[in-house]
Amino acid sequence: IASVVLTFMYLGERSAGNTAEMLFRADTVWYAPLNIAYSVGVDGISVAMLLLSAIIVFTGTFASWRLQPLTKEYFLWFTLLSMGVFGFFISIDLFTMFMFYEIALIPMYLLIGVWGSGRKEYAAMKLTLMLMGGSAFLLIGILGIYFGSGATTMNLLEIAQLHNIPFAQQCIWFPLTFLGFG
């Protein structure tokens, strides 16, 4: 329901003429020496991804409503997974985005490993190891973007406005982040 409300609020802001890059923006400094901030906001793509994720979470909730063993624990991990996904889509800061990506990793392992079927332990371990390996590529890519841009912040909007990452470095950092997310 909140995602539908957010979508209508976003569309209302855009139709009212608000042309800001990101709407409903909030910034709080987490770690001042590296200028890492909790920066969140939405644009058209993130609103669409939030709405799709909300539909999937809503469907997943009702599909598992009558789950018997460890129901409370299941919904705790499912909520934490949802938080990681939603947080990832609203993140503007590279570090915050990476943290939300990692937050979703442990709940996926437990949801598959405990409540899955078939070779659930094998599947959960294989997925977790692959995602952790991808996280290493992603972290290297994020750090490369940060240091390669010469930015004083990990804010994606500010890094994008600098336009100073050389093409040769872009050819290195993009595949690493792509592999990390893939």
Predicted features along the sequence, with ranges:
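Transmembrane helix-loop-helix hairpins at membrane boundaries of multipass inner-membrane proteins
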Residues: 1-62, 66-76, 150-166
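Hydrophobic alpha-helical transmembrane segments of multipass integral membrane proteins
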Residues: 1-7, 48-61, 79-86, 103-106, ...
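Alpha-helical multi-pass transmembrane bundles of energy-transducing inner-membrane proteins
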Residues: 10-14, 73-80, 84-172
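Short conserved micro-motifs on helix faces and helix-strand junctions that flank
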Residues: 40-41, 54, 90, 99, ...
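Short, solvent-exposed coil/turn segments
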Residues: 35, 44, 123, 172-174
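Function-critical hydrophobic alpha-helical transmembrane segments in multi-pass membrane proteins
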Residues: 168-182
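C-terminal ends of transmembrane helices
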Residues: 57-68, 110-119, 181
